[in-house]
Amino acid sequence: MGVKGLNQLIKEHSPHAYKEFELKNLFGRKVAIDASMCLYQFLIAVRQSDGQQLTNDEGETTSHLSGIFYRTIRMVENNIKPVYVFDGKPPVLKGGELEKRLLKREEAQKQIDNLKDDASVSDMTKYQKRLVRVSRDQNDEAKKLLELMGIPYVNAPCEAEAQCAELARGGKVFAAASEDMDTLCYEPPQLLRHLTFAEARKMPIDQITYKEAIQGLDMTKEQFIDLCILLGCDYCETIKGVGPVTAYKLIKEHGSLDNIVKYLQENPDKTKYKVPENWPYNEARQLFMKPEVLPALEVELKWKEPDLDGLIEYMVKNKGFSEDRIRSGAEKLKKGLKAGIQGRLDGFFTVVPKYSNTSPLGKDDKKRKTNDKKGAAAKKTKRR
């Protein structure tokens, strides 16, 4: 579900935390991708002209495999090394959100059943997209394809976005890639959005720098997590009527969710906001503060040469894809992976910022400048 309104708040208070660029600007980077979110996007977006998902002759859905295969190749061709991270067992607190999603799918099915025979393709597609969920079989199929492509994947013990953030924090990858803004609650140095969107959509990639985001909001890590819970996350409902502006104001005024809850409960006559009964906000906070993840140091990532014979057997003979296209894709993949990361200059050197004539100098800089002048004067005296 993500965090409602967080994008808006960061853009307003921390515009410097945002960057937009093209895929090629990630040249030489390793990126951890939220696979479950990625597959969900492919099942929705990769469709035939009549709005139906891609299927093979046996009627099996193949949209997710097409998406993984071609988008991964596109990244590798741009000298990006992706690693896909799959969800593990969801936290107990997420049960309520999962139940809501199930109810929405059931409602969408009712709408489809009630559509008349002459219903438009767009109406049918709209409700069909609401039925989409990533099955266990589809996850397994994607893993098999990645293995044959030589692309590493990680099975997270719990939430995929938390594991992506852990890999980024641990230096295994440059950034976490997910559409879910709650990924920022797990402190990835960088969050990438729209990375796996279709090229035809011409959507730039968003990069959000975590440290700059919370600095602009003038919040601690704990306050940022409290803000996200107040805005609404997957783990618990929010306080009815509290939107982004009010949530930000409450955190700034009271300092923490604990103080906000206490104030609202002790002053029911002074506010229209009611705290939900038995609201598990503290449990939600702990899931963000101490997520269940594999330590980055224990995760080994290896990119290998694709198994062409295996790809032909699986994608062509089993899944009905065009052999010419799979061979062509495999060749591009092989070429891209063989080239490897040719290197970014900032990967080999520590970039030292230059001081401009207009930039203020700190105390240490002023001392250094004074000492440099003294040293230069001494050299002139010696030369004389």
UniProtKB/Swiss-Prot annotation:
Region (Disordered): 354-384
EC id: 3.1.-.-
Localization of this protein: Nucleus, Nucleolus; Nucleus, Nucleoplasm; Mitochondrion
Listed transmembrane segments: none
Residue numbers spanned by region N-domain: 1-105
Annotated binding of Mg(2+) 2, by residue: 180, 182, 234
Region (Interaction with PCNA): 341-349
Name this polypeptide is given: Flap endonuclease 1
Annotated source species: Lodderomyces elongisporus (strain ATCC 11503 / CBS 2605 / JCM 1781 / NBRC 1676 / NRRL YB-4239) (Yeast)
